């Protein structure tokens, strides 16, 4: 039997997509490399993906990036939109064994998540995004791989620092499993 998405997850996808757009539009640091910024939306995507799972993470990445592109540029850059969905899915799977909802975010969780997110960012932004740019848009390889390398490094650092801090902060607001006792 198929599991249906909860109302909570659907609402999280909508709100998460909106926040992704806002962060992607207004909380970025320009790099000097064309159409490539230091993004704060991916650390947020990491948090949402870990909390709500890979399907929600993928949809937040897809919807959020699509809306961001249309509101910023007037058109969508589908190769990178697809990659935002893929990285959201990867973040969600990377967080499967973590229990942020019950206040658990151990050093082991941090290390394991950051190894997975670094590997995911390398594959997605360093290989898939540039390859799709070449296949879909016939972009010059040197340009798109330069963008890909910078996006890879900046996303690894941003998710590693800001994403980890967001997850730690979120976990610290949750009640730890077994911490409450009946009087």
Curated annotation (Swiss-Prot):
Subcellular location: Cell membrane
GO cellular component, as recorded: plasma membrane
Main location: membrane
Membrane-related topology note: Multi-pass membrane protein
Annotated S-S bridges: none
Transmembrane domains' residue ranges: 10-30, 44-64, 74-94, 115-135, 147-167
Record carries keyword Membrane: yes
This protein's UniProt keywords: Cell membrane, Membrane, Transmembrane, Transmembrane helix
Tree of life domain: Bacteria
Family: Belongs to the UPF0397 family.
Name of the protein this chain belongs to: UPF0397 protein EF_2154
Species assigned in the record: Enterococcus faecalis (strain ATCC 700802 / V583)
């Amino acid at each position: 039997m198929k599991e249906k998405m909860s109302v909570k997850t659907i609402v999280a996808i909508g709100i998460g997509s909106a926040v992704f757009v806002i962060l992607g539009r207004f909380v970025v640091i320009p790099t000097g490399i064309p159409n490539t910024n230091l993004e704060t939306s991916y650390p947020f995507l990491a948090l949402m993906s870990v909390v709500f799972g890979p399907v929600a993470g993928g949809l937040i990445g897809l919807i959020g990036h699509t809306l961001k592109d249309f509101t910023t540029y007037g058109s969508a850059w589908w190769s990178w939109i697809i990659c935002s969905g893929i990285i959201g899915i990867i973040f969600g799977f990377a967080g499967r064994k973590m229990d942020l909802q019950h206040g658990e975010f151990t050093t082991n969780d941090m290390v394991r998540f950051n190894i997975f997110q670094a590997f995911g960012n390398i594959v997605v932004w360093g290989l898939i995004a540039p390859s799709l740019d070449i296949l879909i848009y016939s972009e010059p390889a040197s340009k798109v791989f330069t963008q890909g390398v910078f996006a890879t490094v900046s996303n690894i650092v941003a998710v590693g620092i800001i994403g980890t801090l967001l997850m730690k902060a979120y976990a610290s607001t949750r009640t730890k499993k077994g911490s409450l006792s009946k009087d």
